[in-house]
Design a protein with these regions (language model features):
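Flexible "arm" and connector segments at domain edges
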Residues: 2-144
Length: 144
């Protein structure tokens, strides 16, 4: 560790860290043949709709990042809150909805079921119908 003013800078052996990361990475995450084997296993042994599920997960991450980038620039970097930027955010939300639809197809569900489940979860978490910081941070067992 190196002391720099009020900050402590840690020195890291990046090669050692990369070796560590490689050691704790699943075979399907590090070997193409294992990834194909896992896809095949999911296809044969379960009713997992892997193409839609993967499309949804990757797309939601990407499009949520694009939406977040606009918000970050407006709130933290001085980008103006204009009708054009609101339109851009709405377009990104539309893309997010498209990927939610992909997830619904993968999970054989509907938007309605997902929203109903969310409402029930939040009613259980906040029985009075009002947000509570303590309940949001200290959840009951099984409250995902």
């Amino acid at each position: 560790m190196i002391r720099c003013g009020v900050f402590l800078l840690m020195t890291v052996d990046t090669e050692k860290y990369l070796d560590f990361v490689a050691g704790v990475t699943s075979p399907a995450s590090s070997d193409f043949a294992e990834l194909l084997r896992r896809f095949t296993e999911l296809e044969v042994k379960s009713d997992c709709d892997t193409p839609h599920l993967l499309t949804a997960a990757l797309g939601l991450a990407a499009e949520s990042g694009e939406f977040t980038e606009i918000v970050k620039k407006i709130i933290l970097q001085g980008k103006p809150y204009t009708p054009d930027n609101v339109f851009h955010m709405k377009r990104e939300l539309g893309d997010i909805c498209w990927y939610i639809a992909q997830a619904c197809m993968a999970l054989d569900t509907t938007f309605d079921e997902i929203i109903e489940m969310n409402v029930e979860k939040l009613k259980t978490r906040y029985p009075g119908g009002e947000f509570d910081v303590h309940k949001s941070e200290n959840r009951k067992v099984g409250d995902l």
